[in-house]
Amino acid sequence: MVMQEEKKRQQPVTRRVRSFSESFKNLFRPPRSRDSSPINVTRIPYRSSSTSPKRSSEPPRRSTVSAQILDPKNSPIRQRSYTLKCCTPGLSHPFRQTGSGASNSPTRHRSISGEEQEIVNSLPEYKRSASHTFHGIRRPRSRSSSVSSCDSSNGTTSSSDSQWAMDSLLDDSDNDLTPYRGSNKDILKSKDRAPYNYIDDYNKKALRRATSYPNPLPSKQFYNERLYTRRSHPDEESLESLPRSAGADVQCIIEQNGFKVYEDGSHEHNIKLSGVIAKLEKGNSLPVHRQGLLSRPRLGITLSGLFKHHKNECDIENASSLLPNVEKSQTNHEKRTGQSPNDSNRSSPTQGREDYLKIVNPDASLGSDELKLINSLSSRIHKSLQNYLQEKNLKPAECIGEQAPTFQDNYGHPVGLVGAGAYGEVKLCARLRNEKDSPPFETYHDSKYIYYAVKELKPKPDSDLEKFCTKITSEFIIGHSLSHYHKNGKKPAPNILNVFDILEDSSSFIEVMEFCPAGDLYGMLVGKSKLKGRLHPLEADCFMKQLLHGVKFMHDHGIAHCDLKPENILFYPHGLLKICDFGTSSVFQTAWERRVHAQKGIIGSEPYVAPEEFVDGEYYDPRLIDCWSCGVVYITMILGHHLWKVASREKDMSYDEFYKEMQRKNQFRVFEELKHVNSELATNRKIALYRIFQWEPRKRISVGKLLDMQWMKSTNCCLIYDST
């Protein structure tokens, strides 16, 4: 018996290797025909919604396809994973194989034709294998130009040419030759090909045609001048937020509501631009009312955190800045050089004193310069508020007689209304570009205008002036320090909204910020009514990665946001994400502190608040509540609704069910049923979600560690982050 088994093992297994394209077609045949081949190659779970009604809710599959290969020699089933990677500069092909034993895994094959067999027969005997046919000849496939669209209801791929789209994802490099029928070599390199001097001219041309392959994709042109890629515009200026390079002739394999995924792994966001911006680009002049008052065209976007419209309007064009001139000059110098002009000669205001505080955390966003600015702003705002109470007019003595540039000089005129908050309106302002303006710009712009978002902060008659002053100062200082961070030669984060200036006019304070023309995440989800407020999983993953990078930047510099929600997440049309609204942010560590300050009490919006905030008198780490909020934001993007209204067992039945199910089964049904483009990404994401939604803060993962998990590492993001 032993001898017979050894003989069976030594006998060559003659079987026809099924190509992946054939396996894909077999998915649409009756189930009986799928197991007819000795090797059963199965796509998991690339199925059309029309043929697989049970899995109609699955989202489209993008790049990674797992194949289960039933080998008669080895049992149990071996798992092969073919993963699509983004093409880096200099690589001629973007496809690689990863996973256990990927280098020896079967690849795409086909039978050779009679004409090709004649070429092989003309070769000398020593160039032909005694037991195998010729290795690796294949014709170039014809590539379809159709786009594989997605079902708007469930995101599944449905196209007559979906076989080509899926087959292209599984091909090896076009520069390699694949083995055929049990070859002893995995890949036949060019040096092993038959010499041409043994073939006549006719066969030379035939062999050349048989072994010719489509031209490789042009290498991507990455712009690494900053932390992320840039898109070239006709005027040779660039918006630094584009995921794909121009000129890459690649096929779109997934398209859903403007979001496109290409066969090289890249993707493209196409978020709707504001209607008023399009009108301004066509016009020759700005629609400005007399005396600079706001004309009434409304934006075609929503910034939902800025809720109501106020009746009283104010003239802001003559507003003057509250920032000291020294601060402005230092900021401009830091923007150019990355360091303060007087770093070597500057002395601390408390230097020489016994209680001089030593800087132990140089990366902290709140340092000595910010402390000086806080004191200066607080003093000027207090004086202005006193004048406002007495004369109902903001005219501080420091501003009278100064010939500093006005609001109109720096930021132009109001041209639209964005929304309104608790303390006033938010307006869109624009000014014409001039010769002094040079890229890169820190806000949205086109060939004619530069745009700014202007937030009005006006005290109410019954408001606490001390609280109002603290809110204005903290919101501006935190946003300004994060968006203009140049300490230790580091650049600002691309996912933090720029805050430029704070001014005052006759009746209010004015904060000037970067304008994001695509609105906020809340408006984006509400606008996707056909998809029930859901985003494609790949698009949501990209946004999640950008959000985590922005939050990590804040945490690395001693600040927690504490109010992360879709209303506070803004976008550019090409998918660049910006975190805004630092009014409730917490400074948990300054430049003079080693320890992290804990806090207590409820901060933020209830659906996004972590459960430990509802415990009376309990102190918590503000960084961990940001991580919880990021998880809730992601689930909202995927499901189109909240998991619960409030993370409290006593107040919300949905959260109580989540708590009980996790206690009883150690899993949550909603997380288990979430679909992704393939099982590997779905599993990695599910593991990360369980790490995020831990009601015990000590068990919850941090934002930095979450970015290091396999889910985020395998996520293709349209920004390129500096690894340092």
Curated annotation (Swiss-Prot):
<feature type="compositionally biased region" description="Low complexity">
    <location>
        <begin position="45"/>
        <end position="54"/>
    </location>
</feature>
<dbReference type="GO" id="GO:0030003">
    <property type="term" value="P:intracellular monoatomic cation homeostasis"/>
</dbReference>
<dbReference type="Pfam" id="PF00069">
    <property type="entry name" value="Pkinase"/>
</dbReference>
<feature type="binding site">
    <location>
        <begin position="418"/>
        <end position="426"/>
    </location>
    <ligand>
        <name>ATP</name>
    </ligand>
</feature>
<keyword id="KW-0547">Nucleotide-binding</keyword>
<feature type="region of interest" description="Disordered">
    <location>
        <begin position="318"/>
        <end position="355"/>
    </location>
</feature>
<feature type="compositionally biased region" description="Polar residues">
    <location>
        <begin position="318"/>
        <end position="329"/>
    </location>
</feature>
<feature type="compositionally biased region" description="Low complexity">
    <location>
        <begin position="143"/>
        <end position="162"/>
    </location>
</feature>
<feature type="modified residue" description="Phosphoserine">
    <location>
        <position position="241"/>
    </location>
</feature>
<dbReference type="InterPro" id="IPR008271">
    <property type="entry name" value="Ser/Thr_kinase_AS"/>
</dbReference>
<feature type="modified residue" description="Phosphoserine">
    <location>
        <position position="19"/>
    </location>
</feature>
<feature type="compositionally biased region" description="Polar residues">
    <location>
        <begin position="95"/>
        <end position="106"/>
    </location>
</feature>
<protein>
    <recommendedName>
        <fullName>Probable serine/threonine-protein kinase KKQ8</fullName>
        <ecNumber>2.7.11.1</ecNumber>
    </recommendedName>
</protein>
<feature type="compositionally biased region" description="Polar residues">
    <location>
        <begin position="338"/>
        <end position="351"/>
    </location>
</feature>
<feature type="region of interest" description="Disordered">
    <location>
        <begin position="1"/>
        <end position="81"/>
    </location>
</feature>
<keyword id="KW-0597">Phosphoprotein</keyword>
<keyword id="KW-0808">Transferase</keyword>
<keyword id="KW-0418">Kinase</keyword>
<dbReference type="GO" id="GO:0004674">
    <property type="term" value="F:protein serine/threonine kinase activity"/>
</dbReference>
<feature type="domain" description="Protein kinase">
    <location>
        <begin position="412"/>
        <end position="712"/>
    </location>
</feature>
<feature type="region of interest" description="Disordered">
    <location>
        <begin position="93"/>
        <end position="188"/>
    </location>
</feature>
<dbReference type="GO" id="GO:0005524">
    <property type="term" value="F:ATP binding"/>
</dbReference>
<feature type="active site" description="Proton acceptor">
    <location>
        <position position="563"/>
    </location>
</feature>
<comment type="similarity">
    <text>Belongs to the protein kinase superfamily. CAMK Ser/Thr protein kinase family. NPR/HAL subfamily. HAL5 sub-subfamily.</text>
</comment>
<dbReference type="InterPro" id="IPR000719">
    <property type="entry name" value="Prot_kinase_dom"/>
</dbReference>
<feature type="modified residue" description="Phosphoserine">
    <location>
        <position position="232"/>
    </location>
</feature>
<keyword id="KW-0067">ATP-binding</keyword>
<dbReference type="InterPro" id="IPR011009">
    <property type="entry name" value="Kinase-like_dom_sf"/>
</dbReference>
<dbReference type="GO" id="GO:0005829">
    <property type="term" value="C:cytosol"/>
</dbReference>
<keyword id="KW-0723">Serine/threonine-protein kinase</keyword>
<dbReference type="GO" id="GO:0106310">
    <property type="term" value="F:protein serine kinase activity"/>
</dbReference>
<feature type="modified residue" description="Phosphoserine">
    <location>
        <position position="238"/>
    </location>
</feature>
<keyword id="KW-0963">Cytoplasm</keyword>
<feature type="binding site">
    <location>
        <position position="455"/>
    </location>
    <ligand>
        <name>ATP</name>
    </ligand>
</feature>
